[in-house]
């Protein structure tokens, strides 16, 4: 249980996005403008999760 205390709630935790132009990683919070901090480009891609994602075929 102590390990979960270090994790911030999802609303406050910044997401990591990758710039579509210069490919740098940017941490963007919920109220931050969607813009690269290096080049100012506005198209950002969400970084792929490292957690296992499984889809069931039906």
From Swiss-Prot:
InterPro entries the UniProt entry points to: RNAP_P/RPABC4, RPABC4, RPABC4/Spt4
A GO cellular component entry from the record: nucleoplasm
Amino-acid positions noted as binding Zn(2+) in the UniProt annotation, renumbered to this chain: 19, 22, 36, 39
Alphabetized SUPFAM superfamilies for the sequence: RNA polymerase subunits
Domain of life: Eukaryota
One Pfam family linked to the record: Zn_ribbon_RPAB4
Keywords tagged on the record: DNA-directed RNA polymerase, Metal-binding, Nucleus, Transcription, Zinc, Zinc-finger
GO BP terms, alphabetized: transcription by RNA polymerase II
Zinc finger (C4-type): 19-39
Entry keyword annotation includes Cell inner membrane: no
Keyword Secreted: no
Gene Ontology MF, one: DNA-directed RNA polymerase activity
Entry-linked Gene3D superfamilies: RNA polymerase ii, chain L
Location(s), subcellular: Nucleus; Nucleus, Nucleolus
Role according to the record: DNA-dependent RNA polymerase catalyzes the transcription of DNA into RNA using the four ribonucleoside triphosphates as substrates. Common component of RNA polymerases I, II and III which synthesize ribosomal RNA precursors, mRNA precursors and many functional non-coding RNAs, and a small RNAs, such as 5S rRNA and tRNAs, respectively.
PANTHER family in UniProt: DNA-DIRECTED RNA POLYMERASES I, II, AND III, DNA-DIRECTED RNA POLYMERASES I, II, AND III SUBUNIT RPABC4
Family: Belongs to the archaeal Rpo12/eukaryotic RPC10 RNA polymerase subunit family.
Subunit structure: Component of the RNA polymerase I (Pol I), RNA polymerase II (Pol II) and RNA polymerase III (Pol III) complexes consisting of at least 13, 12 and 17 subunits, respectively. Pol I complex consists of a ten-subunit catalytic core composed of POLR1A/RPA1, POLR1B/RPA2, POLR1C/RPAC1, POLR1D/RPAC2, POLR1H/RPA12, POLR2E/RPABC1, POLR2F/RPABC2, POLR2H/RPABC3, POLR2K/RPABC4 and POLR2L/RPABC5; a mobile stalk subunit POLR1F/RPA43 protruding from the core and additional subunits homologous to general transcription factors POLR1E/RPA49 and POLR1G/RPA34.
Protein known as: DNA-directed RNA polymerases I, II, and III subunit RPABC4
Originating organism: Mus musculus (Mouse)
Gene that encodes it: Polr2k
